[in-house]
Amino acid sequence: MEGQRWLPLEANPEVTNQFLKQLGLHPNWQFVDVYGMESELLSIIPRPVCAVLLLFPITEKYEVFRTEEEEKIKSQGQDVTSSVYFMKQTISNACGTIGTIGLIHAIANNKDKVHFESGSTLKKFLEESVSMSPEERAKYLENYDAIRVTHETSAHEGQTEAPSIDEKVDLHFIALVHVDGHLYELDGWKPFPINHGKTSDETLLEDVIKVCKKFMERDPDELRFNAIALSAA
């Protein structure tokens, strides 16, 4: 059965940062645009970077790859540290054009770096859900009105008109984060985190870009890719 539907947020750092501010995140870390994958464009991004959100289209080619990847991991296994905070996605549109779940993944896996304001709604949600399963976290978010109301307010603050809540969105956001020396792809539509190998605080952005390029190479005719990085302000 399909879960609740939330309006998608715009892939816009200004909207994202305002949304997180309203949830009680201190602005010592801010999302910024990743204007391109070339080294000269990456060099203008403030460092350090602690997470990247990648926007990409859900296409037939991607769905074929996703199924093959899942089957391969289930048969061969992978190492995933228990330190990773991961949640499933049951809210439709929550990752369309930029997702609350992607933002939660980015912040939850960097609690040692970010700061929260007193009474932060997001901090409260993370503390209350820390011992839950990925499925339980998803259900808890569905009924977490303080985040839902803030989400809907932010969805109307973008530069483009928010789509109808019933409009199908074929764009999806994932979070790419560094946890315990490894780069993880966190996608609530997948059954588990994806371990993309070793990384570090210093090399995270460059390692993430390698993963992003693979997404683009799988759909060379698609132009609907975008990325924003959570970097030190």
Swiss-Prot record:
Enzyme Commission (EC) number: 3.4.19.12
GO molecular function: cysteine-type deubiquitinase activity
One protein family per Pfam: Peptidase_C12
Chain positions of site Important for enzyme activity: 187
Entry GO terms, CC: cytoplasm
Keyword Cytoplasm annotated: yes
Major place of residence: cytoplasm
Active site per UniProt: 95, 172
Annotated site location: Transition state stabilizer: 89
CDD domains with a match to the protein in the record: Peptidase_C12_UCH_L1_L3
GO biological process: ubiquitin-dependent protein catabolic process
Keyword set, alphabetical order: Cytoplasm, Hydrolase, Phosphoprotein, Protease, Thiol protease, Ubl conjugation pathway
UniProt-listed PROSITE patterns: UCH_DOMAIN (PS52048)
InterPro entries (alphabetical): Papain-like_cys_pep_sf (IPR038765), Peptidase_C12_UCH (IPR001578), Peptidase_C12_UCH_sf (IPR036959)
Tissue expression profile of the protein: Expressed in various tissues at low level.
Reactions the enzyme catalyzes: Thiol-dependent hydrolysis of ester, thioester, amide, peptide and isopeptide bonds formed by the C-terminal Gly of ubiquitin (a 76-residue protein attached to proteins as an intracellular targeting signal)
Record-annotated UCH catalytic domain positions: 5-232
Phosphoserine sites (modified residues): 133
Localization of this protein: Cytoplasm
Region of interest (Interaction with ubiquitin), residue spans: 8-13, 222-227
Entry keyword annotation includes Protease: yes
Family: Belongs to the peptidase C12 family.
Functional note: Ubiquitin-protein hydrolase is involved both in the processing of ubiquitin precursors and of ubiquitinated proteins. This enzyme is a thiol protease that recognizes and hydrolyzes a peptide bond at the C-terminal glycine of ubiquitin.
Protein name: Ubiquitin carboxyl-terminal hydrolase isozyme L4
Naturally occurring in which organism (per UniProt): Mus musculus (Mouse)
Gene: Uchl4
